[in-house]
């Protein structure tokens, strides 16, 4: 049951500050794309680009790990943020997380996994002993393969918010 709970919860990625990362000994972030960085219509905000630049400028490594099989979509976001990426990761399976960890050359506890889904991002990161950060979805609109899980995730998020 512990695997479904994140180490931290924020309304969005912009709330994740360098002071929080330093306090928690996080040297890198593994980022989800859909509804974490971009909305349903594939828009990446200037604020997120700026946030990414600021954190990278302060030594935080970043890497995209996405379940989408649409390489071009992930590649476009990665180029704008100037970070490496892996797509079609099959989260919550461990393989993609371990591959990124190896490339980052860091211990799992020094890597933060940031995503909007408990059943992929959070469980996957927790299974790999990484520091997990749950954020609310950027957009209310979801793809069909995500939408069915949201009511369950919303109940869990309510419990997480109570504990905050």
Model-identified regions with their sequence ranges:
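Asp-based, Mg2+/Mn2+-dependent phosphohydrolase catalytic module
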Residues: 2-31, 42-43, 50-61, 65, ...
């Amino acid at each position: 049951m512990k695997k479904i709970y994140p180490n931290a919860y924020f309304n969005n990625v912009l709330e994740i500050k360098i002071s929080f990362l330093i306090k928690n000994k996080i040297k890198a972030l593994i980022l989800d794309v859909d509804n974490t960085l971009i909305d349903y219509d594939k828009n990446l905000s200037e604020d997120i680009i700026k946030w990414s630049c600021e954190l990278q400028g302060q030594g935080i490594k970043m890497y995209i790990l996405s379940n989408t099989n649409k390489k071009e979509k992930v590649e476009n976001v990665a180029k704008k943020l100037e970070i490496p990426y892996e797509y079609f990761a099959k989260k919550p399976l461990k393989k993609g997380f371990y591959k990124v960890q190896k490339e980052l050359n860091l211990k799992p506890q020094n890597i933060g996994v940031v995503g909007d889904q408990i059943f992929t991002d959070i469980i996957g990161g927790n299974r790999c002993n990484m520091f997990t950060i749950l954020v609310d979805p950027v957009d209310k609109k979801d793809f069909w393969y995500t939408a069915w899980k949201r009511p369950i995730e919303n109940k869990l998020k309510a419990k997480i918010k109570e504990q905050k």
